Amino acid sequence: MVTMDNSDKIYDLIGSANNNDVDSQNELVRVFVHNCFIRSVLTFAKPFKWNNIVENAIQDSNYTYFILCFHGHKYNRVKYQEIYKKIIDGLFLRISKSSSLDALTYNNLGFIYHNDIFKKNKVIKVISHYCKAVNMNSKHAQYNLATFIRLNYYKQEFVKLLSKTVFKDSTLPISKEIIFKKIYELYKLSASQFNPNAEHSLSTTCEFREFIGQKERDKWLKKSAKNGLSISQYSIGTKYLGGDVTNRKYQKGIIYLKNSAKQGDTGSQISLINIYSKEYGKNIMTNINEMMYWYLNCEQYTSFFMNIFDVFPIVCNTMEIDNKSNEENQNITNIETIILSKIQLLLVKIKYDCVCNNSITITNILDELENKFFKIIESRQKIQNSSSIFYISQMRLVDSVYQNIIDQQNKTGIIPFVKNYLVDEEIYMSIGFDSIEICDQLEILLNNDMYAENIVELLWRLDELCKEKSYYSKILKITNMLENYRSQVITFLEDNLTLRENYFFKKYKHIQRNYF
């Protein structure tokens, strides 16, 4: 069973549900209804593409509640209005033939009128349906009715309706204090049945101070965060960040923010971006990769990021290299990839700093370095192609071989990115197992040749520069060294191109090559 205590499994459940696995869809709906609201589901689930979603939403009150919660999310109300109309029409036809309804159906009817979903907002019907569900102890209706009253309590006509419905048995005049006491009671009833939204409302509604102390408010906020409400996780996370970074609460704050950010909470994502940017100097690879990860997952920042940088990161790398390693002739492609990823991260950091400091001009030296960086990428591809070491983005592999390469990449820590999407096997050349063996042999030859030419020494020096914290003063040195490295690589390529091609054709002429 999936709960918010093992919420990481929810993402697996969402993936299976989106692939139209019926059991996963049923379980995801059940978990969503039980938790009353899960931000990650609203962010990543695609119920409008599920098979039989209209029929299920008409017949099953759990599915109805589930799909109604998507109505106000992003542009769903406009994008899927035809689907919603079919559901609402079918639902009202079904209930017109039913002699009795369950609590969740009454709640759903109140929600439909409340949010004007193909039914004109009639306040009396909203209150009436919610009250019927509340009388059946629906935690969803308890929360929804409390919220509806809280948003409208100041209107005289609304108070008159309350006197005929919610407060029909009351002998006292209806005052603001009495109204908020009722709101508080409804929230507490809902929270006691596990409703993170109600728990959060108990902790944040200012008018409840007469009924609840700060200690209890904090308790409800923590409970709501533990139960998976992203806004509560964000609130606690930012609250804990006020202390020293080594403080235990600070580290807990990071965990809360990450849990919220994973669900798609923009505020948490932006907070993490800023935190890892400031912490850059302490750990170049960990912190900048973290910053980039949340940057690329932050919907609000993605378009902004694309306008600042020419492309998304080509490589994000968690692997380190050791020039004192006992391993003879470490793989030069791995070394080069790691160093180039560091250089690009330096560029990202510098440009990010310029943006955050409201700097209008990004200096020519940065553009020059970025230009040289991409020329290095091109040079590396030329080397690999010249020796028939097919770069993974230029070949299509049978599934088993493709998976083998991906597994190997996962072991090395190198994850290729191009334009913010993982390599897509649909664009690759089709080759077989023999070709993989050929590539391995030729890569060893290339590796040995480049070591023999002492080209790799430049890479070690580059890596040392990238490790230094005062990277601003090292930009020019890195730029010059990159140019030196590139010129040597190109010279090496030109000198060896014919020899290496002849070697390939002579030894492996039985292999058919299908170039684009």
From Swiss-Prot:
PANTHER family: SEL-1-LIKE PROTEIN, SEL1L ADAPTOR SUBUNIT OF ERAD E3 UBIQUITIN LIGASE. This is Putative sel1-like repeat-containing protein R850. It comes from Acanthamoeba polyphaga mimivirus (APMV). Keywords: Repeat. SUPFAM superfamilies: HCP-like. The keyword Repeat applies. Sel1-like repeats lie at residues 103-138, 230-265. Transmembrane segments: none annotated. Gene3D superfamilies: Tetratricopeptide repeat domain. The keyword Repeat applies. One of its GO terms (biological process) is ERAD pathway. The lineage of its organism: Viruses, Varidnaviria, Bamfordvirae, Nucleocytoviricota, Megaviricetes. InterPro entries: Sel1-like (IPR006597), Sel1_AlgK (IPR050767), TPR-like_helical_dom_sf (IPR011990).
